[in-house]
A protein has these predicted regions:
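Residue-level signature of mid-helix packing/kink "hotspots" within the transmembrane helices
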Residues: 23-31, 118-119, 123
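C-terminal ends and interior cores of transmembrane alpha-helices
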Residues: 51-66
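C-terminal membrane-cytosol helix-exit motif in multi-pass small-molecule transporters
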Residues: 85, 143-162
Length: 220
């Protein structure tokens, strides 16, 4: 999104604002979507959410040349409906493996794949940008989204009902000790990563090497 908005609109302020709409809407609504998956099953939620997100991303590519308000709103929809694949897969591991040692190994492997994607993704986006333009990373993202979302959904065997496990937790997650401190730490970390992402791309563009910005982000 930062690549696209900064290139088409030539504004890193708007790029940062658009990214903020995307991120904040995801942070607010993703737990609700996850709760729906617990209640109704992964497949019942992940398939429609994936479809909505793919369409919203196409909408983002449309509004980039039109309304700024529309761009921000559709970015919020993209963030709100982007499937949190890490949560889905880790939950599936925890429900499928009873042996704690094997579960720990599986979650460790999951973290390795997750972090690898986090590093490779920006570099790949920069590579596609250099070859096919600033819209190509989002088109590639849609392809990977559909493959991952549909693949995860159709291989799911749960049918929901897991929310009943937590019926006795009436105080809310913020009432759990240390969660508030953890939340503040994660907010600070998010601000650090988000601001540095925009700054790194801005510096790369100023140096005439915008296509290398993704690689710089990955190295960071």
């Amino acid at each position: 999104i930062v690549f696209l908005v900064s290139d088409v609109r030539d504004s890193f302020a708007l790029a940062g604002l658009t990214s903020a709409f995307y991120t904040l809407s995801g942070a607010i609504l993703s737990p609700r979507v996850g709760k729906l998956a617990d209640q109704f099953g992964t497949r019942s939620v992940l398939l429609p959410v994936t479809a909505i997100n793919a369409l919203a991303t196409l909408g983002l590519l449309y509004f980039i040349n039109h309304s700024t308000i529309g761009l921000l709103l559709i970015a919020g929809l993209c963030g709100a409906t982007f499937p949190n694949f890490g949560s889905y897969t880790r939950t599936r591991w925890s429900r499928s493996i009873d042996d704690q040692k094997e579960l720990g190994s599986a979650l460790s492997l999951e973290s390795v794949f997750d972090e690898t994607a986090f590093v490779v993704g920006p570099a790949l986006a920069g590579f596609l940008l250099s070859l096919y333009g600033s819209r190509s990373p989002l088109f590639a993202g849609i392809v990977f989204l559909v493959i991952g979302g549909v693949g995860l959904a159709i291989t799911s065997t749960d049918h929901g009902g897991f929310e009943r496990i937590h019926d006795d937790h009436t105080r809310g997650i913020l009432a759990i000790p240390y969660v508030k401190s953890l939340l503040l730490s994660l907010i600070a970390l998010g601000l650090l990563f988000g601001s540095n992402f925009v700054v790194i791309i801005a510096v790369a563009k100023e140096a005439g090497r915008v296509s290398e910005g993704g690689l710089w982000v990955g190295l960071y």
